[in-house]
Amino acid sequence: MTLWQRLSESSHPVALVFFLAFRLGALFTYMFGLLFTDKFVLMFVLVVLLLAADFWNVKNIAGRLMVGLRWWNEASETGESVWVFETADPQRYINPIDSKVFWMMLYGAPVLWVCLAVLALLKFQFLSLILVFIAVSLTVTNAMAYSRCDKFGKANNIVGQVSGGLLSRAARGTFLGRFM
């Protein structure tokens, strides 16, 4: 079975396509954009726009449709920031293809952006490093929020299967462990 056939079995193919387009579009534009033009500012703006679209899409549409989770941040009456997490009805059918693609890309993108940050640092490309820090902050925020939102452990099961449990055990002992 080809990748296209598997993805066509999605319960929400439009949400899946936009999820992948924004997430991969930002990465590919950052990595290969300067091959097509020498205008760094244009690439910077385009990547930031793709990252913003990805953040909004994941937070408001893809997470709700693909895995039945949603989160937002609001200010309480005392002015404190309060994170609100919402989970769909546990009886709701979650398509395994949607779920696997969502969780793997949700956790995979920040890892790729961190690798690109290390590369930019080693190459002394400090303007690129600013862009990569924006990407890391947006993708990690979504990843941490959805990890906290996932009451039933769907993400932890998928991450455990993919990494053999190494990532989840390592994350529990670090800063990320507070959010998991």
From Swiss-Prot:
Its main location: Golgi. One of its GO terms (cellular component) is Golgi membrane. Coiled coil: none annotated. It holds the Pfam family DUF846. The chain crosses the membrane at residues 13-35, 40-58, 101-121, 126-146. GO terms for biological process: protein secretion; vesicle-mediated transport. Keywords: Golgi apparatus, Membrane, Transmembrane, Transmembrane helix. It is found in: Golgi apparatus membrane. It comes from the Eukaryota. It is a multi-pass membrane protein. Golgi membrane protein involved in vesicular trafficking. PANTHER family: GOLGI APPARATUS MEMBRANE PROTEIN TVP23 (PTHR13019:SF7). Belongs to the TVP23 family. This is Golgi apparatus membrane protein TVP23. The gene is TVP23.
